[in-house]
């Protein structure tokens, strides 16, 4: 089947595609996530005894960029490049039999080292706001420098300007003391070094994960891995590596996160589909008094909680959003307790949750009106001069902008109208010649976000023309299984089903809105 045939099939029945997508969530309950260079590199170093070791090494070799680095452009490439380079140096030091020649390994590691040396010695390095980056970078630089010292190389890597090893040392001492640590730190337990091995502060979940992270799980299992094949954590890791034939994602499971986002994208767009009753029951049951985590091993967070609540309200089974009060601060809502920084997309999703519940339960609307007003004001203050928003949980401003704009469009009232209009203008001004949108290059995911904003909040001829061009682009790239990872974790990742739902929503909106979008036969 040609790409055009696929496009026509997808466009002809977004409802059927949405139904298949929702049913697929039941068959893969841990979630569907792209493999991670960072996490895969950590398993190469920490768990060479694990199934798929050779496949992981070869995958790292195959995904190295021509400039010697790994990962996305700009500062996003530092963490994956450090992890992959250190992993290859570990393989060389141990002399692992991976099926990859020693010369190939040496050349790839040397290219990685040259890029890292240039990158870290320069003054223009700007690092993104990624979880635990202030701990991960020093831990990897220290490991690489140990390799260099063993090989008699006298020029160690330096830390980025403004970054110190002191926070890492403090966390390692904290873990070693066996005192209770914040649950969110377990997601990056591998940075604790030897103290992670069997750390008493970590608790194995029912499905055998530590912190919903393969790297954290392998670091905690440590030297028991080879000798205890039946250990729950070993079993969990074996199950994960089979997903991609060796490489692993940065976070798994993401059960509640994935279901909340998929269902909300589809329902908000008005796509007809049925949700398995047990999925709705599971989603409702996951939300406790303190909210819900994205998946087992993670702390509750306002983002997952609010999107799950919003999806439930859209689907006709609303649940009071009172668990979100646990995340309220004097000015806004935090992602989790003790968060450093803030997130506009999280606050936009909290606005969605409160606003939609108030809409379907008008008798209770007064209870949430003050919070809705506070959220509106906070989001309006953080809009950039060009009309967009940016965020700490996604590399693309199109994700942040569609999250904020749609929440304000639906629940922000008259005071939010100018801001939404400015966002529409920014989207119109940043469309590429081929009809796509994207931070670095046009992508189906980012085009879907831009298209949704135009179709929900726009209306004049310029909007209709841009929407038609964006729709045509989506049809040309209908096979959306591939695409760059843009979501923030320790490394960038791509939640496949979530992105697929966003694209389906945009396609359905383009077909169903009376905005002059051309028929498929004319595209």
Give short role names for the model-derived ranges.
Residues 13-25, 199-202:
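A short helix->beta-strand "capping" segment at the edge of beta-propeller domains
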Residues 65-70:
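Nucleic acid-processing catalytic cores of prokaryotic defense/repair systems
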Residues 1-12, 28-55, 72-98, 118-187, ...:
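An alpha-helical repeat/solenoid feature that recognizes helix-turn-helix modules
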Residues 21-22, 60, 112, 116, ...:
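Buried hydrophobic core positions in alpha-solenoid tandem helical repeats
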Residues 14-19, 192-195, 327:
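Helix-turn-helix repeat elements of alpha-solenoid scaffolds
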Residues 107-108, 473, 520:
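A short, surface-exposed, charged and often Trp/Pro-enriched helix-loop connector in the C-terminal portion
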Residues 187-201:
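Edge strands and adjacent loops of beta-rich recognition modules
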């Amino acid at each position: 089947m040609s790409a055009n045939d696929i496009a026509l099939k997808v466009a002809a029945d977004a409802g059927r595609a949405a139904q298949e997508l929702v049913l697929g969530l039941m068959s893969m309950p841990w979630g569907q996530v792209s493999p991670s260079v960072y996490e895969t590199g950590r398993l190469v170093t920490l768990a060479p005894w694990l199934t798929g070791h050779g496949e992981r090494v070869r995958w790292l070799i195959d995904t190295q960029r021509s400039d010697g680095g790994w990962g996305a452009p700009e500062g996003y490439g530092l963490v994956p490049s450090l992890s992959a380079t250190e992993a290859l140096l570990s393989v060389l030091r141990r002399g692992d039999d991976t099926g990859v020649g020693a010369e190939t390994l040496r050349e790839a590691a040397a290219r990685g080292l040259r890029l890292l040396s240039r990158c870290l010695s320069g003054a223009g390095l700007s690092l993104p706001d990624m979880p635990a980056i202030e701990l991960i970078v020093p831990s990897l630089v220290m490991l690489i420098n140990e390799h260099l010292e063993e090989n008699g190389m006298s020029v160690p890597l330096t830390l980025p300007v403004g970054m110190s090893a002191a926070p890492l040392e403090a966390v390692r001492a904290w873990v070693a003391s066996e005192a209770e640590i914040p649950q969110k730190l377990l997601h990056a337990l591998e940075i604790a070094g030897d103290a992670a091995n069997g750390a008493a502060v970590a608790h194995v979940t029912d499905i055998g994960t530590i912190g919903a992270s393969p790297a954290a799980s392998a670091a905690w299992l440590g030297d028991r891995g080879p000798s205890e094949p039946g250990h729950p954590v070993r079993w969990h890791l074996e199950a994960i590596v089979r997903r991609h034939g060796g490489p692993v994602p940065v976070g798994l499971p993401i059960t509640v996160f994935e279901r909340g986002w998929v269902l909300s994208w589809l329902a908000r767009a008005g796509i007809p589909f049925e949700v398995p009753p047990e999925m709705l029951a599971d989603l409702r049951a996951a939300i406790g008094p303190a909210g819900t985590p994205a998946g087992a091993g993670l702390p509750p967070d306002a983002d997952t909680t609010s999107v799950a609540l919003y999806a439930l309200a859209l689907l006709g089974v609303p649940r009071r959003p009172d668990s979100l009060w646990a995340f309220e601060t004097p000015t806004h809502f935090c992602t989790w307790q003790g968060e450093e920084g803030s997130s506009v997309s999280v606050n936009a999703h909290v606005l969605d949750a409160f606003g939609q519940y108030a809409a379907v339960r008008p008798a209770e609307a007064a209870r949430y009106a003050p919070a809705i007003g506070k959220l509106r004001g906070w989001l309006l203050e953080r809009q950039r001069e060009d009309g967009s928003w940016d965020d700490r949980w996604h590399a693309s401003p199109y994700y942040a902008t569609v999250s904020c704009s749609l929440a304000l469009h639906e629940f922000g009232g008259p005071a939010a109208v100018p801001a939404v209009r400015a966002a529409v203008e920014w989207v119109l001004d940043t469309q590429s010649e081929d009809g796509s949108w994207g931070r670095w290059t046009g992508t189906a995911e980012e085009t879907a976000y831009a298209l949704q904003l135009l179709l929900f909040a726009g209306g004049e001829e310029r909007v209709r023309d841009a929407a038609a061009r964006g729709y045509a682009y989506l049809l040309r790239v209908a096979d959306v299984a591939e695409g760059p990872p843009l979501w923030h974790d320790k490394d960038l990742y791509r939640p496949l089903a979530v992105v697929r739902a966003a694209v389906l929503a945009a396609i359905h909106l383009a077909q169903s809105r009376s905005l002059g979008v051309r028929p498929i036969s004319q595209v």
